[in-house]
Structure formats: C-alpha cells, structure tokens
C-alpha cells in the first residue's frame, strides 16, 4: 500500500479488502475490554488538521488513534498560527519538523491533501498523509467505512447494486464511493437532478438516472447525500420542498425497497429533506453502524500506513 491515503483510487481490491478485514479484527479485539486500548501505535504521533467543521470524521480519527495508544494532537485553524496568517505549507512543514508520524487533513480546497503530501515529502521521516475530505474532491475513509457497513449487512459487495442519491456535484463522498465500490465489484447508480451532476459524469463507471422511484426496487443499498447548500452560489433546484418530493427518501419510497436493502447516509442528515426521520431511524438504516465502523476502519488505515500490512494487525 502507498504511504498516503489521498484518494480511493490509491487502493487496489486486495488493499481495500485487507483494510476492511483488519477493521473487523480491530472491532473483535475490542469486544469485552474494560479499557479500550491496543498497543499497536504506541510511541506514534498522529496530528489531525481540520480546517472545516466535522463531528463524525474528526472524533472517529481521534478515537481510532487513542484506542491504538497513539499520541493524538488536534490542530484547528482558529487555535493555531493559521489564524495569524500562516500558510498551510508552513504549518505542514512545522508539524513534520515536530515529529508527526501521520497528518490527517480536512480542508475546503480540493487537492489540499495531495499538496500536503508533496510539501512534507522527505527521504526519511516524512509523515503519512490521510485525506479526511478535501473540498468536493474525495473522502476515501468514508468510502471504506461505507463498504465495511455494506459487507456486514449484505454479506458481500461483489455484484451488489448501490444507488447513490442527491447532490453528487458537491459530494466528495460520492466520488470516493464510486471509485471504491467499482474496485470492489459493485454496480453503482447515481440518481440526481441534472444540475447536481458533475460534468463528464457519464464517463464514470456508473449508470446515471433522474428517476429515483424506478431505481429503488432493484437496489441492494441506497446512499443518501445531503444537499450542500454551503457550496452553492446559485439555484440548483426550484425549492427544498420540490427537491424532497423528487429525490428524498420518504416513508412511501422506502416501501419500494427490497426488505433486505440497506439505507446509508454519511451525515450530517437533513431530516425531512433528503431522508425522513422514520426512514433514518428504521431497521433498514445503518447510519449508526456507519459511525461505529468509522472508528474501526480508521484504526485499520492508520495501522496499514504506519505499521505495515505484513505485521500482525492485533497485538493482544
């Protein structure tokens, strides 16, 4: 596996499967432990750099590092020299000089994680960089935790039909999921209004549809995306109500799904817009399972980058 995780395209099928397998092993290793600590990353320093708001991703990376006995340090724009005008490059070089083993970055600019990896590259002692979401580009660990959730719920991913619904244009989650699910052998369908699909989307390894009702009966899983109004400068649809009527997963639409189908959402959810509260809280919803899996997947990613897949994943 490469030294960084910048995009889901970095992962081969074997590498992705190894991470998912180790995530399951970490989950099992922690069951029944009064103190949730493994010595896997003892003596390692993990620094999180979050320049956008986050709850699930930031907390799960922090928990993952601490459960593996790493020293985890949080750097935010408001609490660092960034607030004084320091550039991302100078911040990155400072953290490398301070001895960071891993830098986990979330940033509003697409390509920020790649830049960070290039800036901190060195012949020896360069930190591993993990992309925790860069603008509208990618979010590879979210795709991994979604894949783990699907594998647990469905028994496998190969040949499964996954329908991704909503604001694909602004969604780094959608991009990473398309790449990873394709790598793992799933069939991916994108459902969105034409205004919320990227240019060139028909060259992606997906089927594109604008009719959600037509796609639900054959779906093994549905991944609902939030409308990212904070990234929109104009009108992408007539109204929130009309969007919800056409592309929201309502109780009525849930009835179109097979009983075995799984409902995913990367969060945060806009209940009543892209998903109803009753669907979000139903037995088909795997939203909280996704959160739990996020910790275990990020443990596995840190292990693969910092320790190496050739070593035993779990030390009792």
Swiss-Prot record:
The family database entries (SUPFAM superfamilies) matched by this protein are listed as: Aspartate/ornithine carbamoyltransferase
| GO MF annotation, one | aspartate carbamoyltransferase activity
Its EC number is 2.1.3.2
Gene3D superfamilies noted in UniProt? Aspartate/ornithine carbamoyltransferase
Organism the protein comes from:
Mycobacterium sp. (strain KMS)
HAMAP family (alphabetical): Asp_carb_tr (MF_00001)
Family in the record: Belongs to the aspartate/ornithine carbamoyltransferase superfamily. ATCase family.
Subunit record text:
Heterododecamer (2C3:3R2) of six catalytic PyrB chains organized as two trimers (C3), and six regulatory PyrI chains organized as three dimers (R2).
The enzyme class is: transferase
Quote the Pfam families the UniProt record gives.
Answer: OTCace (PF00185), OTCace_N (PF02729)
Q: Which UniProt keywords apply?
A: Pyrimidine biosynthesis, Transferase
Q: What is the gene name?
A: pyrB
Binding residues for L-aspartate: 84, 172, 226
Highest taxon, organism lineage: Bacteria
Summarize where carbamoyl phosphate binds, as residue positions: 56-57, 106, 139, 142, 267-268
Q: What is this protein called?
A: Aspartate carbamoyltransferase catalytic subunit
Catalytic reaction annotation: carbamoyl phosphate + L-aspartate = N-carbamoyl-L-aspartate + phosphate + H(+)
